Amino acid sequence: MKPLKRILRILKTISLYALLLIYLSPFFFVLINSFKSRREIISNPFGLPDVWSLDNFVTAFQKMDFVSAFVNSLVITFFSVIGIAVFSSMTAYIFVRTDWRFNKVMFFVMVAAMLIPFQAIMIPLVQIYGGLNLLNSRWILIYMYLGFGSSFAVFLYHGFIKAIPLELEEAAMIDGCSRIQVFFRIVFPLLKPTTLTLII
């Protein structure tokens, strides 16, 4: 049996490496072709370039304004992720730890909002923002990402916060922490797995 298991293990390993090569091959060819001229890409799309050239990268940076696009993506992603993580975790904490009458209703409304596809409200949103002269702005895009990402984030944080023992917060309050200090010093650090999931 041992030789058979060893053969099966080797076959599985070979299959996984073959699958990895298949998945990585498009990225490899894109990278290789980025060093070729247009004529060489058409004539020899799968081979190595005859002359390694950085002209395509220079063109991308100069004509396509790649640096500006990259900075925009970086700023929008950074502030969107930070905003979603902070505001959604605070919202979920309020839903879990307070006994307001409409907490469950508001939570289910937020969860139901995840069912609404972005395509269904994309055109009305563009019309509204266009009427307010808010188009072509980083901050309005961040605001939209906050709105669309918060529902799922609240759903994730809600389940995780319910599993945190209430005694930890009560002990912190006895030591003199306010509700905000309890959240940021006790609860939020315990939410690292959920926060990393959202960031990724």
What residue spans do the PLM features occupy?
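A structural signal for multi-pass alpha-helical bundles of membrane permease subunits
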Residues: 2-200
